Amino acid sequence: MSWSKVKYFFFDTPEEKEAAQYSYEKEQTDMKKQQDPPEQQDVPFAKVQPKQNVVSIETAKQSSKVVLLEPRTYSEAQGISDHLKGRRAVVINLQRMSTDQAVRIVDFLSGTVYAIGGDIQKIGPKTFMCTPENVDIVGAISELFGEEEETNIKRW
């Protein structure tokens, strides 16, 4: 390998010599010809309204209902749950049922109330109030139901 090849390898190559022979015209760019950035335009937008905690009295009056029920069989539990899903409070009197079926209904309704985020409270002997999440229960009824409740202590 000759010294000239090494020289071309590191320093000057024949292609560079050819490129140096050509003359390039320098392009001048006109700064005025370049596009200016577009002007900012006002774009209308919808104003986001914060969620209001105020409900009109007429709306609350129409949607608030309490359903009084006295089921006689366990098969009526699904109908009671449908009232709860419809956001209506339900008062259930279970005195005309056998204790076993009453316990099953209370278990079923407890699951329903839990699923919808509501509440269930005992308001008397074999009488319960189930409420959906849109109804608040305030206060408590004392347990002065008499001796009947004390003798029948099985589950509730």
UniProtKB/Swiss-Prot annotation:
InterPro entries linked: Cell_div_SepF, Cell_div_SepF/SepF-rel, SepF-like_sf
Locations listed in the record: Cytoplasm
GO CC terms in record: cytoplasm
Keyword Cell cycle in record: yes
Chain intervals with Basic and acidic residues compositional bias: 23-36
Principal location: cytoplasm
Keywords: Cell cycle, Cell division, Cytoplasm, Septation
Region ranges (Disordered): 23-45
Statement: the UniProt record of this protein carries the keyword Cell inner membrane: no
GO BP term, example: division septum assembly
Domain of life: Bacteria
Functional description taken from the UniProt entry: Cell division protein that is part of the divisome complex and is recruited early to the Z-ring. Probably stimulates Z-ring formation, perhaps through the cross-linking of FtsZ protofilaments. Its function overlaps with FtsA.
Xref: HAMAP family: SepF
Assembly and binders: Homodimer. Interacts with FtsZ.
PANTHER family: CELL DIVISION PROTEIN SEPF
Record family assignment: Belongs to the SepF family.
Protein's UniProt name: Cell division protein SepF
Record gene name: sepF
